[in-house]
Amino acid sequence: MAETTSDLFEKAVRLHSRRLLAIARAIVGSAAAEDVLQQAILNLYQHRQRYDWTQPAGLMRRTVVNEALRLLRQPRMSLVADDHPGRADSPVRGMIDDEMIQQVRKAIARLPEHFRAALVLCEYENMSYVQIAEVLDASVPQVKTWLHRGRRQLAEKLKAFADERKLKDAK
């Protein structure tokens, strides 16, 4: 018996939801990630008859990214860093690691949305330029530009943190 569209949709959601949540979390932060995922799944469900659910990963990623970017465009949206305990050898090292992670997250959060989305998909999802271009509805050269500029801006933002850290350590 052939699987129905609804069966394939449910299977796709079960199979991909953890990865999609990670993408949403990387783009909008943990506070809004579940909302982004739920809205993306709802949008897909409402239009499930339109799509081929035999290979849904790309469609689902693109929908989550689009929903995350839509949410970021809303003026009241602010990013919140995750509060995961650090895994360090000592409490002091753990505090330093947590501070660094928090600064990286803040720096990523301050990037323009397309730079942030491209970086997340490239660095966290290990997607190719072609895949990122498909998800973000852009050309491959545009994706390369976003990645280059995003990395450069991220490095500049983190350099300020590193310089500040050196001053604190020198005291």
Where are each of the predicted segments found?
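Short, charged helix-capping/linker segments at alpha-helix termini
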Residues: 1-11, 21-39, 47-55, 164
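Acidic, proline/glycine-rich intrinsically disordered inter-domain spacer in sigma factors
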Residues: 7, 78, 83-109
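C-terminal flanking helix
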Residues: 17, 21, 41, 112, ...
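Short, small-hydrophobic-rich alpha-helical interface motif
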Residues: 20, 24, 33-44, 60-63, ...
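Short, aromatic/basic-enriched loop-to-helix "N-cap" motif that marks the start
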Residues: 48-63, 140, 145
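Arg/Lys-rich amphipathic alpha helix in sigma70-family domain 2
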Residues: 62-82, 97, 160-161
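DNA-recognition helix of helix-turn-helix
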Residues: 65, 69, 136-162
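A short pre-motif secondary-structure segment
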Residues: 118-122
